[in-house]
Amino acid sequence: MTNYQLQIKRFVFGPFETNCYVISTDDRILLVDPACSNDYEQRELENYISNLQSSISNIQLSIVATHGHLDHLWGAAWATSRWNTPVLMHEADIPMAQAMQSQYNLFGIRRQPEPFPIENIKSKILNLKSKMSNFELLETPGHTPGSVCLYFPFANNHSPFVITGDTLFHRGYGRTDLPGGNIGQLIDSLERLFTLPADTIVYPGHGDFTTIGAERR
């Protein structure tokens, strides 16, 4: 495999302080969990991505969701319209994301959700890997049925890292008391994550980064 330059940028967006990540290489941008919840946050994200696009010709952008919860998708309708591309997520969480009003009602949020295009990430994985060859999709159900982690085992300027959504946090893990949660599945998913190299950096859906080695101790 050929190594390449990689950048990762974290934004903290919305009332749930959700981490949104932008991963960029020479010709691909992955926008992970478009959590921007207002105009200011949208402009902040747009300006950063526009700067990347202006410095690299023909760069392609994909939007990926680690799971279908509302706090990770506040800005999905805006982002899919802005960059004319769907949100890619695991098929098991698509019904949840399409029933966003139910999630709003569950949390008492008085807001009208906007629909946005969604596609099954597993049907697009070969296309993603063609531009980001070391990207691996890890299926990690438990917090939700379709939770996924994005694992990058190498890049010549960055340690291995994994974006874990709400599966694994610094000194914690995702709740399973929401619809679709399953503690047994979550434990299995955590055990699989703990088989990754100890120096793998964990970029979670909320809070600060950690490492696999620190969390499995």
Task: Please name every model-derived segment.
Residues 1-8, 26, 47-61, 118-134, ...:
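Short, basic, low-complexity termini and linkers enriched in Ser/Thr/Gly/Pro
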Residues 4-48, 149-164:
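Conserved beta-strand hairpin/beta-sheet module of binuclear metal-dependent hydrolase folds
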Residues 22, 128-155:
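Core dinuclear metal-dependent hydrolase active-site scaffold
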Residues 32-34, 61-68, 87-90, 139-142, ...:
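Active-site neighborhood of phospho(di)ester-bond hydrolases with catalytic His/Asp-centered motifs
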Residues 37-40, 57-134:
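Active-site HxH/HxHxD metal-binding segment of metal-dependent hydrolases
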Residues 38-40, 68-74, 94-97, 145-147, ...:
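Active-site environment of divalent metal-dependent phosphoester hydrolases
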Residues 151-153, 159-161, 185-217:
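Divalent-metal (often Zn2+) His-rich catalytic cores of metallo-beta-lactamase-fold enzymes
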Residues 160-164, 168-170, 175-184, 194:
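Flexible, gly/pro- and Lys/Arg-enriched active-site loops
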